[in-house]
């Protein structure tokens, strides 16, 4: 039986050397890619199948939007487990964040109705406390969820500008400049950056990624000549902060929930790439060699409760990892 199992587990490619004796990078083989594709079609939810087709099979952006609409509520917000660790059907800022990230992913046009409905939800003030949108909401506790999505009174202190920095980045990218929500987003952006610049300690990997989204949005605004903040010092500090946040011990990447290089770096043009090039190469090799018996990637967390629901959520997250990792491997020319 052990010999049979060994045949099913993805085998690690031996490191090859070129004629100069230099170590060559590992690559994902076509047969492995096909195995991953088959797993997706057997296990992924319709939204992630639409994303898969969009990224790898010349699929239609509209199919992703249509699938995403299944998670949207009448108030313009999102729920229903779009962020797969919280099954609350009610709209919440963290679910809106998840929707915004998917729309950024497919470069959704500004005139799509889904954009305007999200802006309307954010403008409504639901779950906004005057400074930030709350990462947790009370009704989370009534539905299956990971423990970190349990509502607690110290939600603002715990989560900071996660997901607010991403939400204001979305508003600044897609909102109209003369609207109240756009003006509000600019004010929040100033306060968020001032808070970040004043901090002497590091922030979480999740809040850091939200600040990256805000930086990207501000840079897009500057290209449009809509300057309202000097982002050079913010950008410089963010680079240093990300370098500190990335876990440098590669042995922990597959067993511990931590910030790997690819959590922040998605291409060689990333502002974080040069300082982390060696670590990035290591992670790309590890992605190829560390797939599970099904040919895909395991997640590194567990709810510790709601076992049946988590088993479903786990597959949803695996599908998300498939898309993220294959996009990454393709970007770095690691798929043969």
Predicted features, each with a name:
Residues 9-12:
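Acidic, Ala/Val/Gly-enriched low-complexity intrinsically disordered segments
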Residues 15-25:
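Short, Lys/Arg-enriched N-terminal segments with co-localized hydrophobic residues
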Residues 23-336:
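Preference for long, amphipathic alpha-helical scaffolds in soluble/luminal domains
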Residues 1-2:
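Methionine residue identity
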């Amino acid at each position: 039986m052990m010999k049979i199992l060994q045949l099913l587990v993805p085998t690690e490619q031996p490191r090859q050397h070129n004629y100069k004796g230099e170590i060559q990078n590992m690559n994902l083989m076509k047969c492995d890619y096909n195995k991953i594709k088959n797993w997706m079609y057997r296990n992924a939810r319709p939204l992630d199948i639409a994303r898969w087709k969009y990224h790898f099979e010349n699929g239609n952006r509209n199919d992703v939007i249509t699938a995403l609409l299944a998670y949207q509520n009448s108030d313009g917000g999102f729920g229903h487990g779009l962020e797969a660790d919280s099954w609350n059907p009610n709209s919440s800022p963290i679910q809106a964040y998840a929707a915004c990230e998917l729309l950024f992913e497919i470069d959704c046009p500004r005139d799509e109705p889904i954009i305007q409905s999200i802006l309307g939800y954010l403008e409504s003030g639901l779950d906004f406390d005057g400074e930030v949108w709350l990462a947790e909401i009370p009704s989370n506790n009534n539905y299956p969820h990971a423990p970190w999505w349990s509502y607690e009174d110290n939600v603002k202190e715990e989560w900071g500008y996660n997901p607010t920095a991403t939400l204001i980045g979305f508003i600044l990218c897609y909102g109209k400049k003369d609207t109240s929500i756009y003006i509000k987003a600019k004010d929040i952006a100033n306060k968020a950056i001032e808070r970040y610049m004043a901090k002497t300690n590091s922030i979480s990997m999740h809040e850091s990624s939200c600040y990256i989204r805000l930086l990207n949005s501000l840079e897009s605004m500057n290209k449009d000549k809509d300057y309202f903040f000097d982002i050079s010092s913010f950008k410089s500090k963010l680079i240093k902060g990300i370098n500190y946040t990335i876990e440098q011990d590669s042995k922990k990447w597959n067993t511990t929930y931590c910030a790997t290089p690819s959590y922040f770096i998605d291409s060689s043009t990333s502002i974080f790439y040069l300082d982390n090039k060696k670590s990035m190469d290591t992670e790309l090799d590890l992605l190829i060699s560390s797939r599970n018996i099904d040919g895909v990637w395991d997640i590194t967390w567990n709810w510790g409760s709601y076992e049946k629901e988590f088993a479903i959520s786990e597959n949803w997250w695996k599908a998300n990892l498939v898309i993220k990792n294959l996009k990454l491997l393709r970007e770095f020319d690691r798929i043969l």
